[in-house]
Amino acid sequence: MKFIALKTKDGSSKGNITFFCRVLHVSRQGYYQYLVMKDRPWKYQPLADAMKDILTEDICNDTYGRTRMYQALTMKQPKNVDIPSERTVYRVMEEIGISHHPRRKPNGITKADREARKSEDLLKRDFHAEEPLTKCVTDMTEIKGCDEKLYVSAIFDCFDSSVIGLAMDTNMKASLCKETLENAAKAYPSIRGAIIHSDRGMQYTSQLYREAIQKYGIQQSMNSAGGRCHDNARCESMWARMKTELLYDRYDTEKMTTDELKTIIWRYFTSYWNNRRICSTNRGLPPMIKRQQYYASLKEAA
């Protein structure tokens, strides 16, 4: 259609229109409809602009897929924008080139101590929690820096996917897991009685970690026999999202020092992840927003 309009100066020569339509197998009616429609504004332009605004709010938002973009639009309710179905949101994202496709996933790094005493699997892959600080998962991951590897350990609350304990060091000893637990207990003293689930890595079966578990009155849970990764899938998926959103195709970590890595990871979890990131498992609510709503509902009920 664009070729015909160019050759005929927008339809000024009827003879040329007939010839080009016949050669290119285009009907004259279709061509004239194109002339009427081509200068009209795209009906999804306000929606496209709103989505681009969402992507620029945070550097990690450019990893939003169709679901989180739809949830972000639903939460924010941009002015003068009619929010269509999730499928239409995806089509518009494809049209303007902002659709996100999942990248690689990290592998687990902890190794089991086959001789150590194991704890029972209390969660049995049920990661749903009705209340905060009842079910938590913990794990660690590694990131290569220019000087040495950085090991990141975290505890996630299954209720809202928030990070309630975080610690980083250049070793993956049991002391790192203990520090993570201590940080969580300091920030949330009511964690006493909660279940904290981990894999069967030697850090979590160590005497040092078990003593910390007992000190804070926490119930320890571990993957079932065989160390199947799906038994701690919730935590593995958290690391995958962090690396996809923060690191992959964004930073060359092997050119960064471990101190620099600590800074961006700490900021990512404590500021972005907990307070601003659209979380699909929370129906789009950032973790701390869901938590605030929960406690607000308890006050209203009282």
Where are the model-predicted features located?
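Basic, flexible linker segments flanking DNA-binding modules
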Residues: C21, R28-E131, C229, P286-A296
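An active-site-proximal beta-strand-loop segment
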Residues: R125-I164, T170
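Active-site beta-loop-alpha junctions of metal-dependent nucleic acid enzymes
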Residues: K144, E148, L166-P189
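Short, amphipathic alpha-helical "recognition" segments used to contact nucleic acids or chromatin
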Residues: M1-K14, K52-I59
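RNase H-like polynucleotidyl transferase catalytic core
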Residues: P102-G108, G193-R200, Q214-A233, Y248-M256, ...
